[in-house]
């Protein structure tokens, strides 16, 4: 099924230029949205919680900085870019009491709307603008006269102008230069969570660790296992990123290509696919989200326990030693924000 793709010529920039936009949060996406919107002629203010470490950065960038409630009262378009697990509380305490008829509430990810943690009144436009790249890339591409593709969606449209508003917003942050793709809150939320859990984070992490363990348990040095199962992954991912799986297979040796074809299906087989379907089902029916919410309400205890157990793996200790030998490798864990 072909998808629609919209560009700058399809968007009316004056729509968002005629609104007052509050960006709630000034992290990776927040700073990029705010600066790109401002340079596209949009009036922008930043909403931050009291005591936020981001206040100084936002003020140094020349933005009017308000608390979340003040920003919500001032604006008629509110883009909520705080972490998923904080959004419901911010909405309940600061945004909802200040929403006015005709206001629009936008998101960069659909989780809280799709699973009902946030339920605005019927007179509020609910939309999403989700660049498919990190904030620093969204900003850099905009400055270079380019853009990052964006997804847009409208969940509630009492005024009938939700898509035009979302498209205008997407164009103002540079998305229309690359392409704006309409979707739904359900599709964006489910596919995003599934990709993270089954492939990008959960699946990849377990594949790396298990490969490392197999080699070490067979008597090979942990350093050799680290190089072959983790370090070289970037080379492969870069090739896939640049030109797809076909490009990767074209670029590696015939030995690697042949071995991948005959052994890959032994690692990821029909049983794996069935378990992935189970993960998808848990996302679709809300099982995962209930567990996520319970973790937050429990003070992140489960997350902290999982994090500690995973961080204690031998592969982490091995990597710390080996990365000290690599002057070209940045270790963000040792950098200060």
Curated annotation (Swiss-Prot):
Classification via InterPro entries: 6-PGluconate_DH-like_C_sf (IPR008927), KARI (IPR013023), KARI_C (IPR000506), KARI_N (IPR013116), KARI_prok (IPR014359), NAD(P)-bd_dom_sf (IPR036291)
GO cellular component, one term: cytosol
Enzyme nomenclature, EC number: 1.1.1.86
UniProt-annotated binding residues for NADP(+): 26-29, 49, 52, 54, 84-87, 135
Enzyme class per UniProt: oxidoreductase
UniProt cofactor note: Binds 2 magnesium ions per subunit.
Pathway: Amino-acid biosynthesis; L-isoleucine biosynthesis; L-isoleucine from 2-oxobutanoate: step 2/4; Amino-acid biosynthesis; L-valine biosynthesis; L-valine from pyruvate: step 2/4
Pfam families given in the database record: KARI_C, KARI_N
Keywords, ordered alphabetically: Amino-acid biosynthesis, Branched-chain amino acid biosynthesis, Magnesium, Metal-binding, NADP, Oxidoreductase
Residues annotated for Mg(2+) 2 binding in this entry: 192, 228, 232
Annotated binding of substrate, by residue: 253
Single annotated GO MF: NADP binding
Cofactor dependency: Mg(2+)
Domain spans labelled KARI C-terminal knotted: 184-329
GO biological process, any: isoleucine biosynthetic process
Reactions it catalyzes: (2R)-2,3-dihydroxy-3-methylbutanoate + NADP(+) = (2S)-2-acetolactate + NADPH + H(+); (2R,3R)-2,3-dihydroxy-3-methylpentanoate + NADP(+) = (S)-2-ethyl-2-hydroxy-3-oxobutanoate + NADPH + H(+)
Active site annotation, chain numbering: 109
Residue ranges of domain KARI N-terminal Rossmann in the record: 3-183
Top-level division of the source organism's lineage: Bacteria
Transmembrane segments annotated in the record for this chain: none
Residues reported to bind Mg(2+) 1: 192, 196
Recorded family membership: Belongs to the ketol-acid reductoisomerase family.
Function, as annotated: Involved in the biosynthesis of branched-chain amino acids (BCAA). Catalyzes an alkyl-migration followed by a ketol-acid reduction of (S)-2-acetolactate (S2AL) to yield (R)-2,3-dihydroxy-isovalerate. In the isomerase reaction, S2AL is rearranged via a Mg-dependent methyl migration to produce 3-hydroxy-3-methyl-2-ketobutyrate (HMKB). In the reductase reaction, this 2-ketoacid undergoes a metal-dependent reduction by NADPH to yield (R)-2,3-dihydroxy-isovalerate.
PANTHER family, per the entry: KETOL-ACID REDUCTOISOMERASE, MITOCHONDRIAL
Protein name in the entry: Ketol-acid reductoisomerase (NADP(+))
Organism phylogeny: Bacteria, Bacillati, Actinomycetota, Actinomycetes, Mycobacteriales
Gene: ilvC
